Every structure is written in structure tokens, then in C-alpha cells.
Amino acid sequence: MNKYLTWVEVNLAAIRHNVRVLRKLAPPSAGLAGKTKILTVIKADAYGHGMIPVAKVLVKEKVDFLGLSNLTEGITLRKAGIKTPILLFETTLAEQAKDIIDYRLTPTVCTHELAAALNHYAQKRKCVVDIHVKVDTGMGRLGVWHEEALGFIKKLSRLRNLRIQGICTHFPSADTDRAFTQKQIQQLSTLVGQLKRSDSNILYVHAANSMGLVGYKAQILNLARPGLMLYGLYPRPGLEKKVNLRPAMSVHSKIIFLKRIEKGRSISYGRTFVARRPMTVATLPIGYSDGYLR
């Protein structure tokens, strides 16, 4: 017997199905063999689905990268035995450089201080550390402004124990502002062209979240970062008619109380529901404290 009156069930088979669908959606790659590579986003405990069990499914599906927010998440997966390459989306502090190297994580870099610290510890370990450089093309948060990115990358390329494996940006409004998103892609494309002319050997260029993957086909992008769609959620209405995803999470609850109410009685906060006829009302033990908006 389930001791919980309200619970969540996660269907790992649905996640397996969804990642296979996402692979088929990925366009031909730019400069890589086969299709665009897939980085599955499992930050924030895999959006509440359970980071470790979801990661194990994705490892069996041979995804190219796992995407996490921070160092703590990365260490958790490594201690769970996950060996797939892990990209940390958040830039970290220089004081965390040693742990990044010790746990074989790939950091996102947008400060000289972090780059120098990584290079220092990599020299001590006699290894080369892969990094990705975050370029700000309009999100306005993390990242080097795209106008300054070429100079920043050139300086980092002089650090012998770092390898700039990828550059990335982020779309703030891919589902609502196509013109702005296309402008971001163009800015990133300009940077890629500049890097090629300077003989830079960067393997991955990435920006596409779920909406970016299905809504934009940019030749320069060769690594996609789907999040929502991995869990069976659609980034825009109507997409479910074209893409067959399966929801991975379901919420269940048991009725704990039944009551008859007459016409005109109101129910719960704000009295937003008023009975138009006599009816039976069921109460479920789930609410505001569980994240279910009243």
C-alpha cells in the first residue's frame, strides 16, 4: 500500500522515447560527422524527475553530453558513477577550479579569473581541460558580450592547458520573438566566421534549447540542448501535432473528503468558484505548499 496520499510517478520509458524523437529532429551537423549532437538538460534534479535515474537512462541512450547547472550537481552525478561528459551551464568561481578538474567536468567560462585558475590546476595535474565559452547575444546575464568575445577567446587560447571545445549563447525569447532570435544567430555566426579566419579549432557551437531545435535551422549550430521536450513538454502550442512526445511525469492523489454543497456556496481562497447547482465536492491533499497554485 502506498503510504503517501499524493505522489508523483516518473515514466523513464517516456524519457527514453523522447530522446530518440529529439535525435531524429536534430538537423545535419556543421562540420561534425552525422547529425547535430545532443546535450540533454537534466539540471534542477532533471526538472524534478530525478537527476540520477534520468541520467542513467540517457547514458544508455548514448547522449553526447549531460547539461547541469552547477558544480554540486556535477559532483553528485560523478559520485553516482556517471562518466558521460557533463557541461556546467553556470560559470563557476575560480576557487572551484580544482574540483571541476578533479571530477572531470566541463565548465562554462566567461571570466579571465576562472580561466587562469583552471589552467593553473590543469598544469599541476598535467592535463588539458575542455571548456566552453559563454557569449552574450541578448540574454543579458552570464557571458562575454558578443562584441568582445573574439578578443576574449584569443586570450584564452594562449593558455596551454585549456582547450576551447565549444562556444555557446542562449535564446531568451525563441518562442515569442523570431526576429530577435535570428539576430542572435547572426551575431554568433559572425563570431564563428571570425574564429575560423583566425585558425581557431572550436568543435561545438550551440544555442538551441527545445524551441531552438524545432524552430530554427542554423548551419553553424552543431550541438542542441533540449530540456522541456525531453520530459514530454512542448515549447509552443500546436507542436504536439507534429512531434510525438510522451509526458514523463504524472501526479496522483487520493480523495480524503467528500461534501455536498448547495447552489450559491463558494469554495476556497478568493471565492473564485461559486456553485451554480447542488453538487458533490472532493478534497485532495495537495495544494499551495506542494507547488500547486491556488
Descriptions of predicted regions:
Residues 284-291:
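A structural micro-motif recognizing beta-strand termini
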